[in-house]
Amino acid sequence: MLDIKKISSLSDLSELKTAYFADSTAPLDGMWHFGFVPMSDHFGFYENGKLVGYCVLNGEGYLLQFFLTATANANIADLFTLIIENNSSVIGEVKGAFVSTAEPQYLSLCLDNTESFKVNALMFRQRPTAIANNIENIEMTLATEEQLDQLVEFASSAIGAPKEWLTGYYGNLIARQELWGYWESDSILATGECRKFDEHQTQFADLGMIVAQAERGKGLATRVLNFLTQHATSQGLEAMCS
Protein backbone atom coordinates (compact mmCIF):
# COMPACT_ATOMS: atom_id res chain seq x y z
CA MET A 1 0.00 0.00 0.00
CA LEU A 2 1.42 3.35 -1.06
CA ASP A 3 0.46 6.57 0.70
CA ILE A 4 1.01 10.10 -0.60
CA LYS A 5 1.63 12.85 1.94
CA LYS A 6 2.68 16.47 1.68
CA ILE A 7 6.26 17.06 2.83
CA SER A 8 6.69 19.83 5.40
CA SER A 9 10.48 19.64 5.79
CA LEU A 10 12.61 19.36 2.67
CA SER A 11 15.43 17.90 4.75
CA ASP A 12 13.40 14.67 4.83
CA LEU A 13 14.14 14.31 1.11
CA SER A 14 17.91 14.77 1.33
CA GLU A 15 18.85 11.19 0.40
CA LEU A 16 16.23 10.95 -2.33
CA LYS A 17 17.33 14.26 -3.84
CA THR A 18 20.92 12.99 -3.93
CA ALA A 19 19.75 9.86 -5.75
CA TYR A 20 17.65 11.97 -8.12
CA PHE A 21 20.62 14.07 -9.23
CA ALA A 22 22.87 11.01 -9.40
CA ASP A 23 20.48 9.48 -11.94
CA SER A 24 20.67 12.50 -14.27
CA THR A 25 22.79 12.11 -17.39
CA ALA A 26 23.96 15.75 -17.38
CA PRO A 27 23.87 18.70 -14.96
CA LEU A 28 20.36 20.03 -14.43
CA ASP A 29 19.27 23.66 -14.71
CA GLY A 30 20.10 25.36 -11.42
CA MET A 31 17.40 28.01 -11.78
CA TRP A 32 14.71 25.35 -11.96
CA HIS A 33 16.01 22.90 -9.40
CA PHE A 34 17.44 25.28 -6.81
CA GLY A 35 15.31 28.34 -7.49
CA PHE A 36 11.79 27.24 -8.41
CA VAL A 37 11.70 23.74 -6.88
CA PRO A 38 12.34 24.76 -3.23
CA MET A 39 9.39 27.19 -3.32
CA SER A 40 7.05 24.53 -4.75
CA ASP A 41 5.00 21.84 -2.99
CA HIS A 42 6.71 18.50 -2.30
CA PHE A 43 4.79 15.26 -1.87
CA GLY A 44 6.30 12.06 -0.48
CA PHE A 45 5.49 8.49 -1.48
CA TYR A 46 5.40 6.12 1.50
CA GLU A 47 5.27 2.32 1.71
CA ASN A 48 4.66 0.95 5.22
CA GLY A 49 5.71 4.30 6.61
CA LYS A 50 8.99 4.38 4.67
CA LEU A 51 9.70 7.25 2.27
CA VAL A 52 10.40 5.69 -1.15
CA GLY A 53 9.91 8.60 -3.54
CA TYR A 54 8.54 12.08 -4.08
CA CYS A 55 7.28 14.57 -6.62
CA VAL A 56 7.28 18.36 -6.84
CA LEU A 57 4.36 20.46 -8.07
CA ASN A 58 4.62 24.22 -8.60
CA GLY A 59 1.90 26.76 -7.85
CA GLU A 60 0.61 26.63 -11.42
CA GLY A 61 -0.01 22.88 -11.31
CA TYR A 62 3.07 21.64 -13.20
CA LEU A 63 5.31 18.79 -12.08
CA LEU A 64 8.97 19.78 -11.72
CA GLN A 65 10.47 16.56 -10.33
CA PHE A 66 9.31 12.95 -10.01
CA PHE A 67 11.27 10.12 -8.40
CA LEU A 68 10.65 6.61 -7.09
CA THR A 69 13.41 4.39 -5.72
CA ALA A 70 14.20 1.11 -7.45
CA THR A 71 13.42 -0.75 -4.21
CA ALA A 72 9.83 0.51 -4.05
CA ASN A 73 7.09 -2.05 -4.60
CA ALA A 74 4.82 0.37 -6.44
CA ASN A 75 4.83 0.44 -10.24
CA ILE A 76 6.28 3.79 -11.22
CA ALA A 77 4.28 4.07 -14.45
CA ASP A 78 0.99 3.37 -12.66
CA LEU A 79 1.83 5.87 -9.92
CA PHE A 80 2.75 8.58 -12.42
CA THR A 81 -0.45 8.00 -14.40
CA LEU A 82 -2.55 8.15 -11.24
CA ILE A 83 -1.06 11.52 -10.36
CA ILE A 84 -1.21 13.19 -13.77
CA GLU A 85 -4.79 11.99 -14.29
CA ASN A 86 -5.68 13.92 -11.13
CA ASN A 87 -6.61 10.84 -9.11
CA SER A 88 -4.64 11.89 -6.03
CA SER A 89 -6.73 13.96 -3.65
CA VAL A 90 -3.56 14.94 -1.78
CA ILE A 91 -1.70 16.34 -4.80
CA GLY A 92 -4.71 17.73 -6.63
CA GLU A 93 -4.83 19.00 -10.21
CA VAL A 94 -1.81 18.47 -12.45
CA LYS A 95 -1.83 20.47 -15.69
CA GLY A 96 1.49 19.32 -17.15
CA ALA A 97 5.18 18.92 -16.43
CA PHE A 98 8.58 20.47 -16.98
CA VAL A 99 11.27 17.86 -17.60
CA SER A 100 14.83 17.75 -18.93
CA THR A 101 16.20 15.29 -21.46
CA ALA A 102 18.88 14.65 -18.81
CA GLU A 103 16.20 13.08 -16.58
CA PRO A 104 15.64 9.82 -18.52
CA GLN A 105 13.14 8.08 -16.23
CA TYR A 106 11.01 11.15 -15.59
CA LEU A 107 11.20 12.11 -19.28
CA SER A 108 10.09 8.64 -20.37
CA LEU A 109 7.07 8.79 -18.07
CA CYS A 110 6.12 12.21 -19.43
CA LEU A 111 6.45 11.15 -23.08
CA ASP A 112 4.32 8.06 -22.44
CA ASN A 113 1.51 10.26 -21.14
CA THR A 114 1.67 13.42 -23.24
CA GLU A 115 -0.42 14.70 -26.12
CA SER A 116 2.04 17.44 -27.05
CA PHE A 117 5.24 19.09 -25.89
CA LYS A 118 7.40 22.11 -26.66
CA VAL A 119 10.97 23.11 -25.92
CA ASN A 120 11.23 25.57 -23.03
CA ALA A 121 15.01 26.06 -22.93
CA LEU A 122 18.28 24.68 -24.29
CA MET A 123 21.05 23.65 -21.91
CA PHE A 124 24.70 24.31 -22.72
CA ARG A 125 27.79 22.90 -21.03
CA GLN A 126 31.41 23.97 -21.35
CA ARG A 127 33.51 21.60 -23.45
CA PRO A 128 36.38 19.97 -21.53
CA THR A 129 38.57 20.68 -24.56
CA ALA A 130 37.50 24.31 -24.92
CA ILE A 131 40.32 26.42 -26.28
CA ALA A 132 41.22 30.05 -25.68
CA ASN A 133 39.43 32.54 -27.91
CA ASN A 134 39.94 36.11 -29.02
CA ILE A 135 36.80 37.54 -27.44
CA GLU A 136 37.33 41.07 -26.17
CA ASN A 137 37.54 41.17 -22.39
CA ILE A 138 35.00 43.09 -20.36
CA GLU A 139 35.42 44.68 -16.94
CA MET A 140 32.54 43.66 -14.70
CA THR A 141 32.23 44.54 -11.02
CA LEU A 142 30.67 42.61 -8.16
CA ALA A 143 27.24 43.99 -7.30
CA THR A 144 26.73 45.54 -3.87
CA GLU A 145 23.73 45.73 -1.57
CA GLU A 146 23.50 49.48 -2.23
CA GLN A 147 22.95 48.76 -5.94
CA LEU A 148 20.14 46.24 -5.36
CA ASP A 149 17.21 48.55 -6.17
CA GLN A 150 18.82 49.73 -9.41
CA LEU A 151 19.64 46.16 -10.43
CA VAL A 152 16.06 45.06 -9.75
CA GLU A 153 14.70 47.93 -11.87
CA PHE A 154 17.09 47.01 -14.68
CA ALA A 155 16.20 43.32 -14.72
CA SER A 156 12.47 43.95 -14.39
CA SER A 157 12.56 46.33 -17.34
CA ALA A 158 14.76 44.06 -19.46
CA ILE A 159 12.98 40.71 -18.98
CA GLY A 160 9.71 41.55 -17.23
CA ALA A 161 10.40 39.52 -14.08
CA PRO A 162 8.44 40.45 -10.92
CA LYS A 163 10.31 42.98 -8.78
CA GLU A 164 9.43 41.22 -5.52
CA TRP A 165 10.97 37.97 -6.74
CA LEU A 166 14.00 39.75 -8.20
CA THR A 167 14.67 41.55 -4.92
CA GLY A 168 14.99 38.29 -3.04
CA TYR A 169 16.83 36.53 -5.85
CA TYR A 170 19.38 39.28 -6.49
CA GLY A 171 19.76 39.97 -2.78
CA ASN A 172 20.82 36.38 -2.25
CA LEU A 173 23.26 36.47 -5.18
CA ILE A 174 24.83 39.68 -3.87
CA ALA A 175 25.29 38.15 -0.42
CA ARG A 176 27.00 35.15 -2.04
CA GLN A 177 29.13 37.37 -4.33
CA GLU A 178 27.66 35.73 -7.42
CA LEU A 179 26.24 38.76 -9.25
CA TRP A 180 28.19 41.20 -11.45
CA GLY A 181 27.24 44.34 -13.31
CA TYR A 182 28.56 46.13 -16.37
CA TRP A 183 28.12 49.87 -16.03
CA GLU A 184 28.62 52.92 -18.25
CA SER A 185 28.02 56.43 -16.90
CA ASP A 186 26.14 55.06 -13.87
CA SER A 187 23.80 53.07 -16.12
CA ILE A 188 23.60 49.27 -16.09
CA LEU A 189 24.06 47.74 -19.52
CA ALA A 190 24.30 44.10 -18.44
CA THR A 191 24.32 41.77 -15.45
CA GLY A 192 26.04 38.43 -15.09
CA GLU A 193 25.52 35.56 -12.65
CA CYS A 194 27.94 32.78 -11.74
CA ARG A 195 25.98 30.62 -9.33
CA LYS A 196 27.66 27.89 -7.31
CA PHE A 197 25.84 24.86 -5.93
CA ASP A 198 25.82 24.18 -2.19
CA GLU A 199 24.88 20.54 -2.72
CA HIS A 200 24.56 18.32 -5.77
CA GLN A 201 26.39 19.29 -8.98
CA THR A 202 29.03 21.11 -6.92
CA GLN A 203 31.60 20.73 -9.71
CA PHE A 204 29.57 23.10 -11.90
CA ALA A 205 28.82 26.82 -12.03
CA ASP A 206 25.47 27.90 -13.45
CA LEU A 207 25.78 31.06 -15.55
CA GLY A 208 23.14 33.64 -16.32
CA MET A 209 23.06 37.12 -17.85
CA ILE A 210 20.78 39.94 -18.90
CA VAL A 211 21.62 42.60 -21.48
CA ALA A 212 19.73 45.87 -21.84
CA GLN A 213 17.39 45.77 -24.82
CA ALA A 214 19.09 48.74 -26.49
CA GLU A 215 22.49 47.01 -26.28
CA ARG A 216 21.52 43.66 -27.78
CA GLY A 217 23.00 42.47 -31.05
CA LYS A 218 26.32 44.22 -30.42
CA GLY A 219 28.31 41.32 -29.00
CA LEU A 220 27.97 42.39 -25.37
CA ALA A 221 26.37 39.11 -24.30
CA THR A 222 29.30 37.17 -25.76
CA ARG A 223 31.75 39.23 -23.72
CA VAL A 224 29.71 38.81 -20.52
CA LEU A 225 29.45 35.05 -21.02
CA ASN A 226 33.20 34.87 -21.67
CA PHE A 227 33.88 36.77 -18.44
CA LEU A 228 31.65 34.43 -16.44
CA THR A 229 33.18 31.33 -18.01
CA GLN A 230 36.68 32.53 -17.18
CA HIS A 231 35.61 33.25 -13.60
CA ALA A 232 34.13 29.75 -13.21
CA THR A 233 37.21 28.12 -14.71
CA SER A 234 39.49 30.07 -12.36
CA GLN A 235 37.69 28.40 -9.46
CA GLY A 236 38.03 24.93 -10.91
CA LEU A 237 34.37 24.76 -11.96
CA GLU A 238 32.79 23.71 -15.24
CA ALA A 239 30.44 26.31 -16.70
CA MET A 240 26.89 25.57 -17.79
CA CYS A 241 23.92 27.73 -18.77
CA SER A 242 20.48 27.67 -20.35
What are these regions (language model features)?
Residues 31-32, 57-61, 168-179, 183-212:
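A conserved beta-strand-loop-helix scaffold within acyl/acetyltransferase catalytic domains
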Residues 1-28, 130-164:
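Short amphipathic alpha-helix that is part of the acyltransferase structural core
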Residues 97-99, 207-209, 239-242:
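Conserved hydrophobic beta-strand within the GNAT/NAT acetyltransferase core sheet
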Residues 73-86, 211, 217-234:
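Conserved acetyl-CoA-binding loop-helix of GNAT-fold acetyltransferases
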Residues 1-62:
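Generic N-terminal amphipathic/basic segments
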